């Protein structure tokens, strides 16, 4: 489910493939491998379970290097079969004539495997990928052409997949098939690339072409040819992207995640740039659906994990600033519960990668129901934006750490902009004047920088609490989803029990978890912006403090009411309470990172997690 790289050109393929796999490590993986058509026209493949360094060491210990200029590589995240050498990619046919790598899931692999076993084929792995290797091998024997073999085999495959293959009898050619799984082309001088992510070949070229769904691609060092699944030639468009390899370099930082947290002020500034003017919001991305937006009577926000919590956070402001009812849905549940949708519904889909399979399927479901769709994504020209009526890009820049930080903050900012934009269109007059909201929104980059000044205090707190086995997070209003996100970050990175609760729910059950010494982070709304909410949260703090909880408060500067009740206070700048979540999450992100680092865990690549979840 993770990373693919293919290369054909004059360079040593093994070196290019390994560099590409290094750039794809951030997506998460449990094994890695490469296959190269050698100068002697046979395929040599090496694959190992574990980190990429294990594969590198294996290659370095070889008495003879792998020599060849066309090859494929893969980082695997197990979906069929345990992480092991035999289940790692690439997979080969019985004759060792063909090698393939594959992302996605072949949903009818069990049926196909039974057919192949009945025909006398044997299998060396537990994967669905090996099924495709045998099918392609048989088809090639009939057609003697790898493209035609793919045309035949893709008719039999069900599910979402990107399959990339090389064959010893077509030594300078790579052929791939794409169906609902990320894959794009890179064009160099006398060399071409194929990858699931531009990061894999960014140091060689920024000229790319996105491959549409249900396409077969054949490439060599000097040519690219694309057909549909029926074998009919189709056109493609090459464009240049702005991507510098330094953007995926963590030099000078202990981790990509820490680097990305400190990039949040600039990321928010970039996301806001050109989108506000004189107290109004400008979203030209939505101008072509303006009339449709005027007709909507409700909004549905859809996402998974961190993106869902960004949606929850912003839902309060959309209702307050646009006067529209809002519901928040998990992408993987959305299309299975028969939601009531119509042409007056606006569905907004949030995904950092733009490739989250659950969200992509939800977009298609919504469009079939006649719903207007907007996507909020970070990766340009990814699948979800292509299938949405409109897209508003976050401009967070590349995010390498698996756990999202700056993308989360920028997603909320974009949803705030959308809330204000919808309010403008509808002429809705909220309690908080729109011009003031826009002004305060533009102050956020400076205030985020101020929050980062407490980094050392948060780091020390994490060190003191590194032996904690369970940590709770409480919040009210838009602070509640921030509590959920903070708990998720701690689970993702530090592998300890963490739960987020709405503070008002304490007395309805969760207070039973409170015992002497129990750490509880409480997100305290400012008394200036919301004195009623503030008083309620202080009451909640007193309630759990009386039962021995250790209280760590996230509170605005000048809020003295928390001091008698909190064991520690982490201060954030004063802002309108609608914007407090954007500031409150930052110390909580740092805390999760530093606590995990103190335990010796890899904060950039947590176990079992993938950056882009491209299977259902």
Curated annotation (Swiss-Prot):
GO terms for biological process: carbohydrate metabolic process; fructose 6-phosphate metabolic process; protein N-linked glycosylation; UDP-N-acetylglucosamine metabolic process. InterPro entries: GATase_2_dom, GFAT, GFAT_N, GlmS/AgaS_SIS, GlmS/FrlB_SIS, Ntn_hydrolases_N, SIS_dom, SIS_dom_sf. Its EC number is 2.6.1.16. CDD domains: GFAT, SIS_GlmS_GlmD_1, SIS_GlmS_GlmD_2. Keywords: Aminotransferase, Cytoplasm, Glutamine amidotransferase, Repeat, Transferase. The active site is at residues 2, 611. GO terms for molecular function: carbohydrate derivative binding; glutamine-fructose-6-phosphate transaminase (isomerizing) activity. Pfam families: GATase_6, SIS. Homodimer. This is Glutamine--fructose-6-phosphate aminotransferase [isomerizing]. The lineage of its organism: Bacteria, Bacillati, Actinomycetota, Actinomycetes, Micrococcales. The gene is glmS.
